[in-house]
């Protein structure tokens, strides 16, 4: 069997470990041939490929990014690397001409939607969920999330010392456009006093009162963790806006920090390395068993899979009854 593998959308720690898990299992256990497709779906349009061997996969486990490269090419939308052609039809033709029996797609929500469409067209597809945002429906955790939370938590830890030294409020902005999982998990792990996520409405006066109450209790500094997506009207960056409003409400010197793309870079955590390896191996097992049109998922501590059509177009969001939100409120943390 000849399988292709691609990575699409934004990069994150753990992609290379997943590629390694898929390919080493395919080559060493099942005797399959594996073809790497460069730059996501763009590579399927241009036939930009390479053959993998066991040797070529050495050293991948701890590397960030993706050895295959990635792009945001959308095969079902106009534009991109090729124009004035039926891109889905061209991809189907190229898959046949390259002799691919199956394609493994590693990506986020957009990739899952695209994979579901190709599966509906008869392409043998298996997908692996990848995002630092942890917002892919159907899996408890996506690889990349733990690494991003670790990076954000380390930054929050460092801000505690400078905030306490200057008796300031420090606002740190983390990634999460529609889902606040990174803000929630890093905010709780880093001892944030205020945690703002897109899913829970906030009130600046409530936030200001929380900070002033801390001051009355002899706590002269505060840490505020915000997800980038809490602002919906495009006024400013979330951290900048919240910092200005807090300083206006409280009169306390407030500074902001935006972590940005640093959350996507660097080596994956041990948890993500193991999760990626397991997910990659399970993807190859599905292929060997002829189970296509499915996305790998983590349920509890078990790796399973679910139909792609159940995943496409859905988001996994933070809810107010999530255990961490409930526990945070019990401890006096303000969620807005």
UniProtKB/Swiss-Prot annotation:
GO molecular function annotation? 6-phosphofructokinase activity; ATP binding; diphosphate-fructose-6-phosphate 1-phosphotransferase activity; fructose-6-phosphate binding; metal ion binding
- Chain positions recorded as Mg(2+) binding sites: 109
Residues binding ATP, per UniProt: 10, 72-73, 108-111
Q: Which InterPro entries match?
A: ATP_PFK, ATP_PFK_prok-type, Phosphofructokinase_dom, Phosphofructokinase_III, PKF_sf
Group of enzyme by EC: transferase
Major place of residence: cytoplasm
Name a single GO biological process. Answer: canonical glycolysis
The entry's localization annotation reads: Cytoplasm
Q: What residues form the catalytic site here?
A: 133 (proton acceptor)
**Its domain of life?**
Bacteria
What EC numbers are recorded for this enzyme? 2.7.1.11
The chemistry this enzyme catalyses reads: beta-D-fructose 6-phosphate + ATP = beta-D-fructose 1,6-bisphosphate + ADP + H(+)
Swiss-Prot/TrEMBL keywords: ATP-binding, Cytoplasm, Glycolysis, Kinase, Magnesium, Metal-binding, Nucleotide-binding, Transferase
Give the required cofactors.
Answer: Mg(2+)
Q: Where does substrate bind?
A: 131-133, 168, 175-177, 228, 255, 261-264
GO cellular component, alphabetical, reads:
6-phosphofructokinase complex
Pathway where it operates: Carbohydrate degradation; glycolysis; D-glyceraldehyde 3-phosphate and glycerone phosphate from D-glucose: step 3/4
Its annotated function is as follows: Catalyzes the phosphorylation of D-fructose 6-phosphate to fructose 1,6-bisphosphate by ATP, the first committing step of glycolysis.
Q: How does it assemble?
A: Homodimer or homotetramer.
Which family is it part of?
Belongs to the phosphofructokinase type A (PFKA) family. Mixed-substrate PFK group III subfamily.
List the protein's name. ATP-dependent 6-phosphofructokinase 3
User: Which gene name does the record give?
Assistant: pfkA3
């Amino acid at each position: 069997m000849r399988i292709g593998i691609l990575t699409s959308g934004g990069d994150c720690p753990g992609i290379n470990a997943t590629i390694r898990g898929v390919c080493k299992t395919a080559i060493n256990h099942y005797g399959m041939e594996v073809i790497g497709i460069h730059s996501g779906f763009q590579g399927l349009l241009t036939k930009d490929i390479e053959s993998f061997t066991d040797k070529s996969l050495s050293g991948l486990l701890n590397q960030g990014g993706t050895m295959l490269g990635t792009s945001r090419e959308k095969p079902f939308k106009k534009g991109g690397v090729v124009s004035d052609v039926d891109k889905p039809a061209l991809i189907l033709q190229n898959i046949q001409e390259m002799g691919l029996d199956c394609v493994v797609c590693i990506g986020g929500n957009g990739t899952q939607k695209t994979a579901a469409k190709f599966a509906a067209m008869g392409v043998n597809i298996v997908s692996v969920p990848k995002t630092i945002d942890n917002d892919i429906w159907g899996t408890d955790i996506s690889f990349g999330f733990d690494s991003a939370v670790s990076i954000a938590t380390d930054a929050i830890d460092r801000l505690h010392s400078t905030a306490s030294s200057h008796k300031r409020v420090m606002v740190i902005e983390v990634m999460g456009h529609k889902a606040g999982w990174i803000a929630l998990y890093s905010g709780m792990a880093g001892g944030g006093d205020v945690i703002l996520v897109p899913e829970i409405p906030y009130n600046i006066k409530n936030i200001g009162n929380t900070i002033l109450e801390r001051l009355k209790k002899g706590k002269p500094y505060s840490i505020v963790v915000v997800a980038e997506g809490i602002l919906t009207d495009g006024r400013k960056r979330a951290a900048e806006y919240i910092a200005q409003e807090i300083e206006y409400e409280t009169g306390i010197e407030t500074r902001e920090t935006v972590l940005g793309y640093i959350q996507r870079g660097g080596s994956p955590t041990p948890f993500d390395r193991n999760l990626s390896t397991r997910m990659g191996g399970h993807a190859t097992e599905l292929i060997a068993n002829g189970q296509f049109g499915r996305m790998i998922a983590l349920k509890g501590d078990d790796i399973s899979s679910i139909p792609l059509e159940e995943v496409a177009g859905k988001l996994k969001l933070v809810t107010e009854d999530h255990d961490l939100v409930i526990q945070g409120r019990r401890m006096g943390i303000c969620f807005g």
